[in-house]
């Protein structure tokens, strides 16, 4: 199972930020730096984006599974989710399923 790349900043409750189409986690670094006093911010690169793995398979079901695997791998129990555009749909579908 391949894991998504992320940059983790700060301390506190985990906040996972999921970027939009053609973006990557670095797009949110400036905002993340303003949240690090209150949150452990995870700037996630979705599959086929940034430094995460590339795959011929690419759909929302798989991106939700990738996010779930990421949360399990990092042993996160309760998370805050923030998604933009494609990342917004990914986190909404994740919230419905899990």
PLM regions and their residue ranges:
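N-terminal cap/lid segment of alpha/beta-hydrolase-fold proteins
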Residues: 1-3
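Conserved HGGG/HGGXW glycine-rich cap/lid loop of the alpha/beta-hydrolase fold
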Residues: 7-54
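Glycine-rich, phosphate-binding/catalytic loops in enzymes
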Residues: 32-35, 58-61, 98
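Active-site loop/oxyanion-hole signature of alpha/beta-hydrolase fold enzymes
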Residues: 42-82
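Conserved hydrolase catalytic core segment
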Residues: 77-98
């Amino acid at each position: 199972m391949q894991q998504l790349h992320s940059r983790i900043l700060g301390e506190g409750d985990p906040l996972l930020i999921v970027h939009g189409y053609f973006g990557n986690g670095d797009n949110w670094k400036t905002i993340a730096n303003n949240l690090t006093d209150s949150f452990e911010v995870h700037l996630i690169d979705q599959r086929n984006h940034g430094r995460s793995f590339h795959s011929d398979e690419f759909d929302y079901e798989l991106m939700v599974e990738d996010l779930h695997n990421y949360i399990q791998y990092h042993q996160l129990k309760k998370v805050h989710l923030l998604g933009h555009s494609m990342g917004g749909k990914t986190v909404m579908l994740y919230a419905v399923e899990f």
